[in-house]
Amino acid sequence: MLNTFNCIVMNSNFTGSVVIITGAASGMGREMALQLAGHHDCRILALDIREKDLQETNSLAGVHSDKIEIHVLDVAQADMINAFAASVLPTLNSKKLILINNAGVALASGRFVDTPAEAFEWLLNVNLHGVIRMTRAFLPYMLQTNQGHIINLSSVFGLAGVESNTAYCTSKFGNRGFTESLRMELIDTNIRTTCVHPGGIKTNITNFSVAAGTRISKEAHQESKDRFAKAARTTAGSAAKQILHCVETGKQRLVIGSDGKFLDGITRLFPVSYTKVVVGLMHKSFGNPYAKK
């Protein structure tokens, strides 16, 4: 599997560093771990809540599996993050730390008024507060060593708000604002930040999405997942390669995919009226769950 990746050269900004990747059991997180293991001399800490899938990530690395250390961790649990940080920080030995906050979940709940408060808060706890917790745990070390890189995964839904995704959009706009604020705070240091806005990526995030609320049936949920799978245009491997390249170039903002670039452009040109265009595209791509049958 690793020989299919055409990554950047071995002698790079990753050389001798420690890379922490959340959400490394599948999708872009797994691909980043595998590409790093196959092409870079660095220590990789792969984190996820799903232990079996983490073990598969390690196994897929083949002869490079010794570079990947797997750790079961739920970014929604502050105690787990604090315990993980307490065990890892003493082992870093002033090496450059690269933190990739990739873990995320999706929610199929319908409109905001139909979304249970506990489901909304669950998603924010993972997608937004998980990023904040991980950054809070490891940024002091970066400041102490005056080096490092924080990569936070937002989304095209952190560029454009869309219906029936109020929780997800809130979390991804939050990640964007958090990352951009950090960029300003760290401008006089050697610590870099990157905010990533992927478009449709061929990953399992919709397969692990949670259906909640009173307006989303199992059939509608499955139809939405099937439509997303067809509409997703970028492979996880391609997205991972672009994200890792940001560490080499110092790029601070990355929009992935032609669909992502389209949304980025239209929201810049038409910051209010883009809504009508996006609604039409969303209904065409994913269907209109509120249309009368």
Task: Outline where the language-model segments fall.
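Substrate-binding pocket helix/loop in short-chain dehydrogenase/reductase
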Residues: 96, 110-112, 119-121
